[in-house]
């Protein structure tokens, strides 16, 4: 329970006591709510995203018993980075959800109980095609229905993706702790940071092409599976990774006087 929740409940209790005549006025009427912290998500630049994916590729073990496992984890993170997916979405994909002729993925029953069909960047579709060829050569006619298989007939585990992500982030020197400076929370890199980064970097590219990011926002929202484009706008607290890094450095070097 948050401090603000306690204040709200206590204020309501004393309002009741005032109505019953036990108090003349509410003793906590003027107690202010705490200011909510502003969260500054970690943003990867396009170059940092490329480095992260390269680091994951170099960590793929060539041993036959490990190769497909490591490649599967890489594919999951690739879809987070290049398609802005939530971490649960690639892990729940079935083989039949990939449509090679259309170069698209059908994402079913997402966070808001919505389905969506997304076109894939050509490079991503090529990687999926190559992955499926490797999978078939190593697993043969496997009965595992998941596009990204785990042990036996199960899907790839969320924690394996997170572990590989954090190892790669550390390997490229981008590991950062979560910091609270004043009323701003500077979040550490997480797999969800790739979704934030996808939104920020996509709109930046659109602006660089001379197009309107505002007009593109509803399309981006639909692609990312948001019910309202305002949910996507929530991700856009920074213009790019550089602006976020400059703010973090500035706030850290200019602490509030005590």
Kindly label every feature range from the protein language model:
Residues 1-258:
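Conserved catalytic core of the tyrosine transesterase superfamily
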């Amino acid at each position: 329970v948050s401090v603000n929740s306690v204040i709200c409940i206590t204020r309501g209790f004393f309002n009741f006591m005032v109505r019953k005549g036990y108090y003349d006025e509410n003793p906590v009427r003027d107690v202010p709510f705490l200011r909510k912290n502003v969260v500054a998500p970690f943003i990867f630049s396009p170059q940092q995203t490329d480095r992260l994916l390269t680091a994951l590729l170099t960590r793929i073990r060539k041993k036959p018993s490990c190769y497909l496992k490591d490649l599967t984890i890489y594919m999951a993170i690739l879809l987070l980075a290049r398609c802005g997916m939530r971490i649960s979405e690639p892990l729940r994909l079935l083989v039949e959800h990939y449509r090679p002729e259309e170069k698209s993925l059908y994402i079913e029953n997402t966070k808001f109980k919505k389905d969506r069909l997304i076109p894939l960047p050509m490079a991503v579709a090529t990687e999926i095609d190559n992955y499926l060829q490797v999978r078939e050569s190593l697993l043969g006619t496997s009965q595992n229905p998941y596009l990204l298989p785990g042990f036996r007939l199960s899907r790839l585990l969320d924690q394996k993706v997170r572990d590989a992500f954090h190892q790669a982030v550390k390997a490229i020197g981008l590991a950062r702790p979560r910091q609270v400076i004043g009323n701003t929370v500077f979040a550490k890199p997480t797999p969800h940071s790739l979704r934030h980064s996808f939104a920020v970097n996509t709109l930046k590219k659109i602006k660089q092409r001379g197009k309107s990011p505002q007009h593109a926002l509803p399309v981006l929202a639909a692609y990312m599976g948001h019910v309202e484009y305002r949910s996507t706008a929530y991700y856009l607290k920074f213009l790019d990774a550089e602006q976020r890094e400059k703010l973090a450095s500035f706030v850290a070097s200019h602490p509030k006087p005590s």
